[in-house]
């Protein structure tokens, strides 16, 4: 069983982290091609393309200039301990044990606009490049076309080697669109999280993001390899009547 999640815009390169054996990203050549393309863009283009403030534009243009495919301890950190958005607050990776982090390394994948796919302990340098950005490169119209074949093949190979051949999709729709799920072996299950508000159950985006992270953390802390066991996630209640084979609905409230 493989679980996929999205990255985060916010990065933490300042807090202290435990010393753990780390790895390097799988698609460094492809990432460097993207960086070199980004270096050719004007600040005005970067700002409009990514909808950034002036300060964030300056920061990320500098990041592109400084970025190199070198992942030393001085300039990079493990991805799961660096991304810092709502999903990652849900995972609470800094409080995972060493054995839980090693389980994550084998069973969790992070989709990325710059790196394609990251293992949790792959070291990353500061960057910002969302999968939905329209960045034409190498006859590809956008990052979906650039990454889809590589990302899909990597996930397909890992699923083929897994016991349950099941992908748990906890990524956002922006990132999951990079995966051609028709070419994956086995099942793809997308958990949907709904909270009770104003008399009905509905997806509330911030809470749903956090819930995706909490479910990912639940999978890692319990060493789950059988998808049926995620139905026992104790922060939401699995709803059999509202679920289908591909979408599992979880309710709270």
Map each language-model feature to its residues.
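Internal, well-folded beta-alpha domain core
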Residues: 93-253
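C-terminal accessory regions
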Residues: 1-2, 183
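Active-site helix-to-loop segments that bind/position phosphate- or nucleotide-bearing substrates
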Residues: 4-95
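Short hydrophobic beta-strand segments
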Residues: 2-6, 166-169
């Amino acid at each position: 069983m493989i679980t996929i999640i999205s990255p985060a815009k916010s990065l933490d390169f300042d807090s202290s982290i435990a010393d753990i054996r780390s790895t390097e990203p799988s698609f460094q050549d492809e990432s460097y091609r993207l960086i070199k393309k980004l270096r050719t863009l004007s600040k005005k283009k970067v700002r409009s393309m990514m909808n950034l403030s002036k300060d964030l534009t300056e920061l990320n243009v500098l990041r592109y200039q400084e970025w190199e495919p070198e992942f030393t301890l001085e300039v990079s950190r493990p991805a799961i301990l660096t991304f810092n958005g709502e999903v990652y607050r849900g995972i609470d990776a800094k409080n995972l044990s060493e054995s839980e982090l090693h389980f994550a390394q084998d069973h969790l994948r992070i989709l990325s606009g710059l790196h394609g796919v990251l293992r949790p302990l792959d070291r990353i340098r500061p960057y910002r490049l969302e999968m939905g950005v329209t960045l034409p490169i190498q006859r590809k119209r956008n990052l979906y076309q650039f990454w889809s074949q590589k990302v899909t093949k990597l996930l397909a190979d890992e699923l083929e080697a897994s016991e349950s051949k099941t992908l748990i999709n906890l990524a956002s729709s922006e990132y999951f669109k990079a995966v051609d799920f028709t070419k994956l072996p086995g099942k793809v299950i997308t958990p949907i999280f709904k909270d009770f508000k104003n008399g009905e159950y509905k997806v509330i985006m911030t809470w749903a993001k956090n819930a995706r992270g909490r479910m990912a953390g639940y999978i890692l802390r319990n060493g789950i390899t059988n998808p049926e066991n995620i139905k026992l996630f104790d922060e939401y209640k699995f709803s059999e009547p509202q679920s289908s084979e591909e979408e599992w609905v979880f309710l709270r409230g």
